């Protein structure tokens, strides 16, 4: 990736755009330890892992496509005699037929064919038992459909539109323990539950009921006692009790009961008897509660036997089954309560000892024992049958069916998988050391879950926090695509199994067994219509980047809006540095859709992690470490702005830090890590808001969301007050053109840049590299905004790898430029800025400051109809000459034509069925042989409300259909463009080749050659200059080594020409071949209109701080308030919009912007006075010295570069004030002072209409304003007559349908209240759905008679019909 590597340059060299215009950085922190990472990494990396495209088959890791194949293959037939194995796969042998741009134009998917190597092994059926003999092996490559490829900028082109697959934040697989917060039962008792969530397979839930019995649910079905599942696993009652309880051992004789005492277990009980030490001293009196102090005394006294009365045993539970040794009969079952009768029996059979369960209310409850009493099953088979009945109600259970069902639920890798993540989380939660293991559950797993759940109920351990980012993980494109692919493969598997079992499998090849349809269908469905595969937001570069970095909790396997509560949407402690707390949509999705923080990334398990600097013994090191939310909790982490001395030691005695999710103060020696950067916690969009720290969170949220809606203006202007992120965003978004290799600019024009690459960058010495960059010109984005690139370099400029060569939409010299810097005044102005309205100066319209270009695409399709083919032609019936004036002879509009609403863009006629002809028509036909009446006009016209210029026409013709003139013309133009590129490349390479040759030949001794070159003469430059260059190869030299080099050069020369010809042929074939259009389509014509939208009242504008408003009016320049020096302001905002909204950032931005502009003005004045480079350098130095850190090195620039820099600073010196580390009040005042402006930031203003001074001084300055994509032109709509709904005959609604305005229920009430009967009648009949009345009305008006006679509204007839359909006869009485 060009962009990915663009940062790896050492910072010593200053990039080309920075030399042209550098920012003064007002951040306080020393140089950033970690450069902002490549912003699209999540998407690109994830998809790269999925495809593993350029990795050899044997070296591929176990994820993505490879993993999906391995999990499904090998497929064995039911008999086991035939096996289909997977060997490896390859993606797209030759480079894909069309590149990204062509796919967009032709409406295709940018994809590569997937070919899979498969091996069919057939075993010999006649082989002796136990020995498998291979009879036959066949290997073949099988085509498995197309896999979409990702573009360089992390989007996918599906059916010609750019889409983005948004990452999903879902609950990680593993085991979770929670309680119901006391909501289930009226007593408010906490009911604990455990849930095992697999990556795929059945969910397993354990839960307590209000009586403290344990139950299990499988897949949220009816609950069963939890011990049923333990029995199904093969445990009996005794083993189950043994797993959950310790036992107390009692010795029985005929009179007494003696307990083997373990003192700890007495805690909290009532002493039944007095407990005395050896000397007879009483430690605990009878009927006293035994406390911890008593227990210490008992332990000290070393009492280990205790005689107890019989009734102490009553109610205790037997732990092990007691059998009569003589007869072998069972006297007492395990889990049976002891009664007086049972004790009598025991004594009668001379049982010497018994074990009871140690159950204690404080630390060991009777839950499992109680549950066993509820459990009606007694052995494994009964338990399995019980589970089968729940899972498959109504089916008769058999032993085999019950066993296989239970086996498949949790223990078969096909049906159940925890995945590596799930296993890691599971083992961690149940307290095991090793983090790997089987993907399926084991007996021990289920028992461990129950054990932890019982412990939590007993008060040991805590429940989990679902919203903790250690329990939620990111699923990116690659992983989701892999899952879909696997689903497709599983569908294929069933079919393959059936085919493998056929008798004639020996004659089949792998290709005959595998049907690729289900796989490609699954992939197509995912990329085309999944909830997370979204139409890319392409308003501006920022909205693209943000869309690709979005994280959604919605989507398949996620939450739904309706069910998501407040907790999920809230900002969680673990979001710090991982997910932005600010940027999220307003409305029903708030908090469910988030944005990744600037430095965040997903680790191998899919958990988000964020970088920290290591702190060792109070010293901050430059080493960074990424920590996930789980690991972070155990460390003390200091903030990024903690005070540090020169050596990196922490200075303060108490340091504010985070520990276990809480903010605390602690001593420096405890600190383990420190934040990398102050902007670590916010997302890209929020990091672009200067003085974010002074804005209220709600407004910052609006600010970051509105920046994404800014429309690219014609003349982008970078913000005077930025944050230093602007360059990063512009480069990473991929809208700019970036140098792939360093070199010198060979030629530049508006649509391409040719770079002669530096020698050191090319692999081959002879070969000189040429990079040709074709720029995108006036193309339509997904949001109909305009994508246009223009070069910023000049011929002869030296560029480094990674430098910006051309600006794209909304970028200015390689920096993001979403809006314009305007001179703003905060004051009321005649009520025109009431309620956030905005007042602007006519100057903004004149200077085209907010003029934007929108590109509309119109498509005309000619199809084959039943009555014959439609035809695209300029011969259209009943259309005047004037309407056809803008079309060419093929019936398609000229490029450059200006068209208005209703104009014809493409003339098209459709055959209509034979109709009964009137006598006149028959006559006409007889005379003229006129066929005008059997076609109707179905031309493509411009939709209402649009005027624009035609900028491009594209024509796609079906294979085998004759191409019209226009198509051939377009193809010719395209081909000449390609030819020009190839010729330029050839020219540059040949020049370099001959340059090398000249060095080789000059001064050598010749052995003969053209132009009568005598043997033994020395070759001179002048001789070579007179000789045509092709003839140089005919020179014969005496030096053998040199001759060899000459021959090699000749070969190379021929090779270059051949390569050019081959490429040209390839392009010609690609251009002239017909498109594979949809069935029944003959021709498609796409016309692109450019619409220029100037700013006007009703358009929505906003600043970067959530200060939005609608333009109320545009005031002439002479009426605007003006400053003392006569400068009129550009825009007037209402000061009341600031205090209640608490976005003070805009005021600070205004002050700093004014200072920046003032400094620029001073530099401009110096240039006008003719200052030289030395003076300019001297005056620029104090400005750039304001940077405490990351100081721009003026010394590195040469004099011409200094002059160029100064010229670019005339409009204002750009300043960066990073988020949470911005300029202070003192610095702003200092800058204002340097610019000779009042340090208060306020100035006296004069009224433009009267010339009088306003009473108070007004806050004036430069603010960066954006024009948002909510334009009044797109919203305003009017209709006189138009289309009607079929059934009700009422006008349609909405702008898209060219509908009318609804006159609703409440409006009817209003007219009724006025008693305006006639108006009301008109509204409800002729203006709505009285069909007959409408036509009569029209007739009357034509006749000059303005009366109205209303008829029957159609909706009344619909009502009558509906009542009749209920078998009620209803009709109107005729008077």
Swiss-Prot record:
Catalysis performed (reactions): RNA(n) + a ribonucleoside 5'-triphosphate = RNA(n+1) + diphosphate
GO molecular function terms noted in the UniProt entry: DNA binding; DNA-directed RNA polymerase activity; ribonucleoside binding
E.C. number(s) listed in UniProt: 2.7.7.6
GO cellular component, one term: DNA-directed RNA polymerase complex
InterPro entries: DNA-dir_RNA_pol_bsu_ext_1_sf, DNA-dir_RNA_pol_bsu_external_1, DNA-dir_RNA_pol_su2, DNA-dir_RNAP_su2_dom, DNA-dir_RNAP_su2_hyb_sf, RNA_pol_bsu_bac, RNA_pol_bsu_CS, RNA_pol_bsu_protrusion
Highest taxon of source: Bacteria
Assembly description: The RNAP catalytic core consists of 2 alpha, 1 beta, 1 beta' and 1 omega subunit. When a sigma factor is associated with the core the holoenzyme is formed, which can initiate transcription.
Function recorded in the entry: DNA-dependent RNA polymerase catalyzes the transcription of DNA into RNA using the four ribonucleoside triphosphates as substrates.
PANTHER family (alphabetical): DNA-DIRECTED RNA POLYMERASE I SUBUNIT 2 (PTHR20856)
Protein name as catalogued: DNA-directed RNA polymerase subunit beta
């Amino acid at each position: 990736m060009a962009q990915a590597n663009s940062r790896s340059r050492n910072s010593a060299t200053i990039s080309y755009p920075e030399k042209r215009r550098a920012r003064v950085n007002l951040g306080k922190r020393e140089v950033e330890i970690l450069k902002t990472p490549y912003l699209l990494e999540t998407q690109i990396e994830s998809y790269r892992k999925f495809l593993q495209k350029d990795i050899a088959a044997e070296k591929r890791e176990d994820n993505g496509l490879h993993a999906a194949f391995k999990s499904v293959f090998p497929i064995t037939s039911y008999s086991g005699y035939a096996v289909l194995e997977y060997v490896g796969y390859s993606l797209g042998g030759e480079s894909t037929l069309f590149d990204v741009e062509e796919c967009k134009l032709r409406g295709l998917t940018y994809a590569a064919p997937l070919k899979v190597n498969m091996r069919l092994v057939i075993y010999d059926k006649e082989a002796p038992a136990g020995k498998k003999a291979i009879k036959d092996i066949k290997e073949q490559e099988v085509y498995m459909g197309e896999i979409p490829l990702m573009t360089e900028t992390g989007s996918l082109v599906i059916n010609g539109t750019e889409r983005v697959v948004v990452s999903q934040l879902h609950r990680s697989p593993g085991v979770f323990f929670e309680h119901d917060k006391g909501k289930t039962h009226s007593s408010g008792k906490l009911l604990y539950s455990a849930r095992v969530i697999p990556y795929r397979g059945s969910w397993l839930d354990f839960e307590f009921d209000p009586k403290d019995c344990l139950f299990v649910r499988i897949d949220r079905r009816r609950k069963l006692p939890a011990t049923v599942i333990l029995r199904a696993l093969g445990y009996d009652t005794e083993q189950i009790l043994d797993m959950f309880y310790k036992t107390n051992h009692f010795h029985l004789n005929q009179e007494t009961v003696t307990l083997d005492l373990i003192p700890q277990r007495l805690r909290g009980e009532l002493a039944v008897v007095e407990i005395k030490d050896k000397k007879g001293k009483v430690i605990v009196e009878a009927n006293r509660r035994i406390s911890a102090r008593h227990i210490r005394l008992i332990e000290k006294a070393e009492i280990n036997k205790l005689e107890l009365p019989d009734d102490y045993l009553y109610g205790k539970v037997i732990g092990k089954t007691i059998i009569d040794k003589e007869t072998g009969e069972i006297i007492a079952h395990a889990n049976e309560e002891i009664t007086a009768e049972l004790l009598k029996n025991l004594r009668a059979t001379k049982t010497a000892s018994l074990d009871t369960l140690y159950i204690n209310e404080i630390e060991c409850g009777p839950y499992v024992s109680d549950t066993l009493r509820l459990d009606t099953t007694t052995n494994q088979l009964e338990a399995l049958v019980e589970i089968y009945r729940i899972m498959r109600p109504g089916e008769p259970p058999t032993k085999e069916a019950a066993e296989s069902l239970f086996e498949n639920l949790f223990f078969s890798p096909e049906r159940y998988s925890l995945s590596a993540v799930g296993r890691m989380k599971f083992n961690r939660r149940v307290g095991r050391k090793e983090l790997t293991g089987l993907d399926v559950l084991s007996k021990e797993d289920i028992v461990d879950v129950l054990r932890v759940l019982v412990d939590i109920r007993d008060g040991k351990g805590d429940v989990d926090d679902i919203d903790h980012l250690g329990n939620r993980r990111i699923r990116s494109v690659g992983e989701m695509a892999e899952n879909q692919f696997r689903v497709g493969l599983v569908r294929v598997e069933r079919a393959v199994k059936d085919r493998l079992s056929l008798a004639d499998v020996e004659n089949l090849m792998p290709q005959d067994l595998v049907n690729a349809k289900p796989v490609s269908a699954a992939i197509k469905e995912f990329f085309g219509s999944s909830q997370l595969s979204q139409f890319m937001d392409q308003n501006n570069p920022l909205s693209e980047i943000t869309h690709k970095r979005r994280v959604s909790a919605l989507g398949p396997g996620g939450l739904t809006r309706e069910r998501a509560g407040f907790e999920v949407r809230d900002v969680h402690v673990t979001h710090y540095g991982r997910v932005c707390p600010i940027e999220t949509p307003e409305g029903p999705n708030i908090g469910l859709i988030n944005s990744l923080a600037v430095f965040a990334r997903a680790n191998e398990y899919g958990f988000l992690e964020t970088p920290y600097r290591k702190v060792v013994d109070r010293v901050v090191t430059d080493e960074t470490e990424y920590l996930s939310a789980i690991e972070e909790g155990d460390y003390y982490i200091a903030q990024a702005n903690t005070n540090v001395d020169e050596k990196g030691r922490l200075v303060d005695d108490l340091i504010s830090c985070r520990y276990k999710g809480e903010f605390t103060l602690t001593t420096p020696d405890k600190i383990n890590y420190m934040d990398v950067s102050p902007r670590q916690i916010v997302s890209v969009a929020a990091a672009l808001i200067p003085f974010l720290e002074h804005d209220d969170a709600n407004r910052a949220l609006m600010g970051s969301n509105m920046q994404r809606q800014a429309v690219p203006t014609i003349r982008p202007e970078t913000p005077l007050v930025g944050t230093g992120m602007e360059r990063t965003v512009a480069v990473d978004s991929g809208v700019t053109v970036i140098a792939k290799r360093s070199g010198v600019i060979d030629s530049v024009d508006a649509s391409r840049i040719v770079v002669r690459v530096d020698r050191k960058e090319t692999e081959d010495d002879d070969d000189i590299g040429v990079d040709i960059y074709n720029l995108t010109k006036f193309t339509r984005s997904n949001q109909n905004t305009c994508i246009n690139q223009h070069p910023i370099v000049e011929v002869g400029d030296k560029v480094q790898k990674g430098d910006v060569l051309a600006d794209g939409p909304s970028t200015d010299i390689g920096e993001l430029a979403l809006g314009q810097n305007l001179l703003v005044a905060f004051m009321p102005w005649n009520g025109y800025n009431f309620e956030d309205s905005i007042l602007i100066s006519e100057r903004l319209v004149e200077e085209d400051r907010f003029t934007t270009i929108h590109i509309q695409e119109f498509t005309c399709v000619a199809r084959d109809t039943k009555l014959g083919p439609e035809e695209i032609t300029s011969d259209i019936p009943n259309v005047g000459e004037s309407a056809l004036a803008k079309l060419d002879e093929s019936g398609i509009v000229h490029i450059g034509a200006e068209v208005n609403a209703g104009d014809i863009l493409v003339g098209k006629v459709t055959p209509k069925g034979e109709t009964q002809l009137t006598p006149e028509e028959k006559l006409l036909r007889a005379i003229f042989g006129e066929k005008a009446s059997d076609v109707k006009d179905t031309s493509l016209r411009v939709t209402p409300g649009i005027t624009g210029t035609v900028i491009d026409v594209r024509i796609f013709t079906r294979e085998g259909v004759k191409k019209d003139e226009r198509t051939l013309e377009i193809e010719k133009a395209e081909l000449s463009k390609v030819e020009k590129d190839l010729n330029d490349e050839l020219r540059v390479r040949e020049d370099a080749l001959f340059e090398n040759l000249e060095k080789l030949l000059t001064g050598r001794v010749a052995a003969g050659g053209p132009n009568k070159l005598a043997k033994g003469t020395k070759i001179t430059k002048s001789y070579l200059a007179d000789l045509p260059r092709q003839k140089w190869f005919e020179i014969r030299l005496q030096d053998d080594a040199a001759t060899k080099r000459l021959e090699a050069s000749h070969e190379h020369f021929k090779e270059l020409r051949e390569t050019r010809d081959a490429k040209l042929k390839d392009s010609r074939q690609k251009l002239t071949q017909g498109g594979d259009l949809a069935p029944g389509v003959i021709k498609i014509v796409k016309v692109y209109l450019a619409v220029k939208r100037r700013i006007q009242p009703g358009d929505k504008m906003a600043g970067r701080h959530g200060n939005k408003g609608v333009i109320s009016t545009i005031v002439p320049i002479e009426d605007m308030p003006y400053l003392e020096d006569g400068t009129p302001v550009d825009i007037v905002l209402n000061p009341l919009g600031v205090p209640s909204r608490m976005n003070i950032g805009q005021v600070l931005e205004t002050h700093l912007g004014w200072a920046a502009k003032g400094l620029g003005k001073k530099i401009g004045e110096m240039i006008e006075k003719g200052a030289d480079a030395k003076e300019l350098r001297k005056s620029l130095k104090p400005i750039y010295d304001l940077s405490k850190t990351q100081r721009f090195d003026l010394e590195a620039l040469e004099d011409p570069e200094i002059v160029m820099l100064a010229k670019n600073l005339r409009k204002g010196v750009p300043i960066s004030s990073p988020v949470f580390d911005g300029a202070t009040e003192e610095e702003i005042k200092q800058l204002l002072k340097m610019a000779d402006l009042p340090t208060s930031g306020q100035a006296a203003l004069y009224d433009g209409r009267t010339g009088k001074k306003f009473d108070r001084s007004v806050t004036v300055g430069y603010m960066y304003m954006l024009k948002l994509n909510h334009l009044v032109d797109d919203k305003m709509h009017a209709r006189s007559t138009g289309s009607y709904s079929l059934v009700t005959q009422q006008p349609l609604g909405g702008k898209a349908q060219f509908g009318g305005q609804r006159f609703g229920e409440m409006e009817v009430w209003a007219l009724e209240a006025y008693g305006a009967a006639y108006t009301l009648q008109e509204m409800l009949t002729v203006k709505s759905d009285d069909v007959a009345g409408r036509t009569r009305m029209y007739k009357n008006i034509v006749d000059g008679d303005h009366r109205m006679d209303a008829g029957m509204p159609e909706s009344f007839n619909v009502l009558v019909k509906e009542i009749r359909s209920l078998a009620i006869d209803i009709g109107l009485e005729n008077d």
